Structure formats: C-alpha cells, structure tokens
C-alpha cells in the first residue's frame, strides 16, 4: 500500500495564496474527516460547482468573530448542543449584484465573496439564505482544533481577509471520506493535503502566546522544584510551570496538566479530587527525579471562581457538575489546552507520560502536536462529599476512575 505523506504547512500556504483548494484533515479522535478549503476572496462559480460536485457535504463560509460581529450575524441557536459545537450563524444570501434565488453557483459565489469583502454591510445580506457562515473562535486552531478555525487561520497566514469556504468530502457511496480516500482525492485533483495538528504546530512555532517570567528555586513539603511563571498575552492571565530535572526533547517526561482549583488546592475541599491529584503528581515527579506540572489559571474547568460557586450552589440543589455548568450558560468544560501546550514546548517537552484520568485532556493535548506515550491515572479515595461528583465525571465525561463502582 502506498505510504500517505501529508504536505507541509509551508507548501500548503503557497497554493492557498494562489487560490487553490486544500484538503484539510482533522484528528481521528475528533470528526476524522477532510474538507475542501479555499480562501473566500478566491472563490468563483466554477469552484463552488467543484465543491458541490466533488465534496458533497454542506457548503459553509468560515469567518472571524470580528467579521461576524461587523455583519451582525447572530448565532443560529443560543445554546449549541451539537457534538463538536459547530458554530453556525444565521444563513445568508447576497442581495443584488445579479443574484436571484441565492442557490445558483453564481449566487453562492457572490455571497461568499461578499462575506470576505470589507465593504459589505449587514443590509447587503438577506437572512435566511443558502450559505452557512461559521464563526471561528478567536486565536483559531490554538483555541479550537476544527476546520472552521483552520480555514480562517490559513487565510490570515496568507495575508487575506479572514474568510474562507469549505465543504466536507463524502465518498460516492455516501460515507465520509477518511484519510486513505482523501489521499486518493488529493492525487486525483493535484491538491495539497494537510492536517490540523500540523497547522497548530506551525502556529505554535511561529507565534508566542505566552510571556515567560524568571525561573526560581522552589523547595516544597513534597520535593525540591524549579518554578517559572508565564503570562498569557491575550488576557494577562498568569500560569505556572513547576518542574524538576533536565531532559532532551525526545524523552517522554512525566507531566501533569493541572487546572487551578482554589477550593481544593488551597483549602483542601472534599467536594472534588483536585488537591489530592496535585499532591500525587508532585510526589511522583519527586520520586522520578524529573517531570513537570503545568498549573493553568482555569478555575472551575475554565468558568472562573465566581461562576464555579454558582455551580456549587446548583449542585447543592441536586444538579450534577455538568448540568450545573450548562444551566449557567457554560459548556461542560471550557478549558484551553493550547496555553499549556506552548508552555510545555518552551520547557522542551514534546513527548510525555501524562498523569490524568481525563480522556479529553489527552485528546486536547495531542491535537496541539504533542505525543503522549503513556497515560498514568491519578486516583484519590472517594468520600461522601465528592462521590456523586466523581461518579458524574466517570459516567458522563468518561474519566477513568476505578475507585467508583
């Protein structure tokens, strides 16, 4: 069987600048699909026809959050419950400019061009329509490893307007095209094919999203460590790397990616297992003689201390930890692993033995181009205050908790 060899991001960017299609694939643990993606400002009726004929999916137009705001494109629903939280806005058609029903290849191309044109006003777009804009997250693939963000990132990296067109690639028999079939499609049409994880790695190498502080000695009750603070450039949040020992970049290092928990880490709360996991991680690293804890300022799975306390109040009234978050308008987990991934890279860690019970954390870090060679559980003994919480994490979030029957 022919070896599948993906293109480099540098090769892909050259084609993208010229208005050529790229095939972009995501992680097999996510959607495991490939999309045709092209810069919005390079679209033509013939290219729309190609996408519809050979892609067979849903024709969408990813745009930046800022662009969606400028065009007054509201989200399609206030509470997105789709599997991967695909960020659909209201659908649109270009008004005027020779457009009629909005469904022809010409009309669709005109609508996509209008989304990219900085002169387009909200009143130039009819709602609903035949094009589905997608609102990309700020910070792109460094925030969400999806095709929407990849498309906008590619446009920005090429110096174009932050807008693109994409469509999923479906086999002729109606099944989703996976990597072997996508590889054949790329050869058939002479298109470059790239992976989102490689785009993430490219951006992490090219861009700095955190500012490194001074390194200091940090003796603790659980071992002797070194500590470096990091400041997130986008919002000023400060994070910590607590580590011990030295290593080379190909060595699998013991790592704990730990989100801050003031109640558990500082006060020893029995409502969660956070404090116990942190201490276990420190003890394991001390025993091993090398390793790192990335302490992320993402209280309450990313919702903040005030909102976490509101969630606690709802839990006292009978809700579980997930439903409490959802009731408050949050996702079950809002953490951003891109920050931790860059901190690990700055520490020279590319391979790790990850200390976690959370499969989503593993997937989240692997999406940023890091290799996890082993998963090491950090289990604490349940108590009467946190047993329901731990059971929820096991049954609804897939955590590997053998102490919970």
From Swiss-Prot:
The positions annotated for binding GTP are 256-260, 277, 299-301, 321, 356, 361
* Binding site residues for Mg(2+) 1: 31
Return the annotated region ranges for DHBP synthase.
1-205
* A single BP term in Gene Ontology: riboflavin biosynthetic process
**Protein's pathway:** Cofactor biosynthesis; riboflavin biosynthesis; 2-hydroxy-3-oxobutyl phosphate from D-ribulose 5-phosphate: step 1/1; Cofactor biosynthesis; riboflavin biosynthesis; 5-amino-6-(D-ribitylamino)uracil from GTP: step 1/4
Which residues does the entry assign to the active site, renumbered to this chain? 333, 335
Q: Which Gene Ontology terms cover its molecular function?
A: 3,4-dihydroxy-2-butanone-4-phosphate synthase activity; GTP binding; GTP cyclohydrolase II activity; magnesium ion binding; manganese ion binding; zinc ion binding
Q: What does the entry's cofactor note say about binding and number?
A: Binds 2 divalent metal cations per subunit. Magnesium or manganese. Binds 1 zinc ion per subunit.
The residues that the entry says bind Mg(2+) 2 are: 31, 147
What keywords are annotated for this sequence in UniProt? GTP-binding, Hydrolase, Lyase, Magnesium, Manganese, Metal-binding, Multifunctional enzyme, Nucleotide-binding, Riboflavin biosynthesis, Zinc
Segments of this protein annotated with the region GTP cyclohydrolase II: 206-405
* Gene Ontology CC entries for this record: cytosol
Q: Which reaction does it catalyse?
A: D-ribulose 5-phosphate = (2S)-2-hydroxy-3-oxobutyl phosphate + formate + H(+); GTP + 4 H2O = 2,5-diamino-6-hydroxy-4-(5-phosphoribosylamino)-pyrimidine + formate + 2 phosphate + 3 H(+)
Detail which positions bind Zn(2+): 261, 272, 274
Write the Enzyme Commission number(s) for this entry: 4.1.99.12, 3.5.4.25
| Cofactor(s) of this protein | Mg(2+); Mn(2+); Zn(2+)
Site Essential for DHBP synthase activity — annotated at 130, 168
> What superkingdom heads the lineage?
Bacteria
Q: Binding of D-ribulose 5-phosphate: at which residues? A: 30-31, 35, 144-148, 168
Hey, which family's this protein in? In the N-terminal section; belongs to the DHBP synthase family.
**NCBIfam families in UniProt:** PRK00393.1, PRK09311.1, ribA, ribB
What is the stated purpose of this protein?
Answer: Catalyzes the conversion of D-ribulose 5-phosphate to formate and 3,4-dihydroxy-2-butanone 4-phosphate. Catalyzes the conversion of GTP to 2,5-diamino-6-ribosylamino-4(3H)-pyrimidinone 5'-phosphate (DARP), formate and pyrophosphate.
This chain's protein is named: Riboflavin biosynthesis protein RibBA
Origin species, per record, is: Porphyromonas gingivalis (strain ATCC BAA-308 / W83)
């Amino acid at each position: 069987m022919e070896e599948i060899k993906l293109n480099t991001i540098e090769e892909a960017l050259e084609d993208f600048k010229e208005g050529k299609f790229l095939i972009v694939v995501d992680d097999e643990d996510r959607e495991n699909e490939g999309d045709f993606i092209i810069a919005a400002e390079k679209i033509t009726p013939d290219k729309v026809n190609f996408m519809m004929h050979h892609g067979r999916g849903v024709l969408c137009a990813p745009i930046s959050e800022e662009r969606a705001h400028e065009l007054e494109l509201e989200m399609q629903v206030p509470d997105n419950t789709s599997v991967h939280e695909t960020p659909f806005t209201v659908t649109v058609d270009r008004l005027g400019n020779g457009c009629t029903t909005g469904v022809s290849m010409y009309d669709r191309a005109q609508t996509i061009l209008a989304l990219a044109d900085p002169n387009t006003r909200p009143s130039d777009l009819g709602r609903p329509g035949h094009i589905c804009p997608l609102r990309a997250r700020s910070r792109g693939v460094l925030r969400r490893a999806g095709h929407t963000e990849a498309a906008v990132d590619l446009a920005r990296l090429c110096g174009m307007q932050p807008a693109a067109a994409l469509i999923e690639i479906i086999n002729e028999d109606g099944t989703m095209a996976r990597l072997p079939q996508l590889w054949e499609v790329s050869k058939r049409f002479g298109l470059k094919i790239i992976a989102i994880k490689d785009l993430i790695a490219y951006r992490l190498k090219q861009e700095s999203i955190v500012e490194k502080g001074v390194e200091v000695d940090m003796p603790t009750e659980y071992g002797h460590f070194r500590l470096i603070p990091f400041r997130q450039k986008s919002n000023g949040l400060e994070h910590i790397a607590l580590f011990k020992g030295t290593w080379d970049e190909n060595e699998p290092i013991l790592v704990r990616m730990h989100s801050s928990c003031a109640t558990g880490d500082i006060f020893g709360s029995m409502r969660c297992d956070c404090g116990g996991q942190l201490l276990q991680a420190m003890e394991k690293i001390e025993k091993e003689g090398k390793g790192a804890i990335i302490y992320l300022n993402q209280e309450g799975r990313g919702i903040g201390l005030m909102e976490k306390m509101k969630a606690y109040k709802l839990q006292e009234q009978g809700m579980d930890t997930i439903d409490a978050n959802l009731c408050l308008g949050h996702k079950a987990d809002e953490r951003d692993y891109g920050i931790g991934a860059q901190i690990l890279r700055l520490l020279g860690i590319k391979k790790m033995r990850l200390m976690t019970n959370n499969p989503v954390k593993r997937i989240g870090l692997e999406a940023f181009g890091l290799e996890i060679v082993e998963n090491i559980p950090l289990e604490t003994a349940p108590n009467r205050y946190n047993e329901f919480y731990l059971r929820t994490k096991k049954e609804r979030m897939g955590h590997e908790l053998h102490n919970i029957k």
